[in-house]
Amino acid sequence: MKLTCMMIVALLFLTAWTFVTAVDSKNELENRGGWGQAGGWGKLFPMARDEMKNSEVSKLDNKRKCAAAGEACVIPIIGNVFCCKGYCLFVCIS
């Protein structure tokens, strides 16, 4: 019982330590709301959505690679080659 309690306390301590010592990314969203500013977290998400539409702020590559019928494809969750027309069952089926 004591060992279980010690493990739980250690896990909580390490989790808190991870969040406290985390370094902010250089690519963070500008003008994000926060606890101290008026608007709070409700202001964060609409601004984040608008900034992600801006190609200069967002460095994500949203281009989809389409495979033709009969070509190899990957399940969308795992890879980046999709069947844009039809279904993927290791190969594109129209």
Curated annotation (Swiss-Prot):
Which InterPro entries does this chain map to?
Conotoxin (IPR004214)
Q: Which GO terms describe its molecular function?
A: ion channel inhibitor activity; toxin activity
What residues make up the propeptide removed on maturation?
23-62
Instruction: Give the signal sequence positions.
Output: 1-22
Which locations, inside or outside the cell, does it occupy?
Secreted
Keyword list, A-Z: Cleavage on pair of basic residues, Disulfide bond, Knottin, Neurotoxin, Secreted, Signal, Toxin
The Swiss-Prot or TrEMBL note on domains reads: The presence of a 'disulfide through disulfide knot' structurally defines this protein as a knottin. The cysteine framework is VI/VII (C-C-CC-C-C).
The name under which this protein is listed is Conotoxin Qc6.1
Species: Conus quercinus (Oak cone)
